[in-house]
Amino acid sequence: VDRSDYSDARTYYHDASGKMDLMHLGAYFDPGMEFDLPEDLNNYNREQLEALFDRPFTGTGVRIIKSHIFANHIDHIKKLFSECPMILALRDDDACLGWWVRCGHFNITYPDYAEYYRDLKTMAKIIDWQNRDIRSAWDYYDGFVARDNQELAGILGIQTPPEEYAQNYAQSDLEVKVI
């Protein structure tokens, strides 16, 4: 896995779980974030998207591209990058908003959610919209449901994370599917 998008500035730790945990690691791509993405990705072809995704990377290998707005463009991304697995992460709308608030809401230092998500009302509306599209893709596409990040790494064929970063998705009120 190409981890060249890593920098200390692209990490976020918080104690929402009761202990200091790494919450974000590496580049994030969304409107208004450090690696800004246009809201309507459906107007972009594969080469244009690759150019956007390449910006934080200097290495080679498998790249993990993280974005919330991918939720609204799953069919388009699957069509353009059919050979690439896509990870769907789903948490109930209210639980999703509650977890985000608990983890620091607009005080999260990386990535910066403020420009695109603006306020809690807008954030709640966008979460509902994104989760609706994730649920639709979850039902439409065949795939593999992962119980934890160790199993997810196996499905993806990448190195398993160290034990100190083990995450049981059910205990985190999260569902994860690779399509």
Regions found by a protein language model. Give the residues of each.
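PAPS-dependent sulfotransferase catalytic core
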Residues: 1-52, 154, 162-178
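Walker A/P-loop-proximal flanking segment of P-loop NTPase domains
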Residues: 55
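PAPS-dependent sulfotransferase catalytic domain
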Residues: 59-161
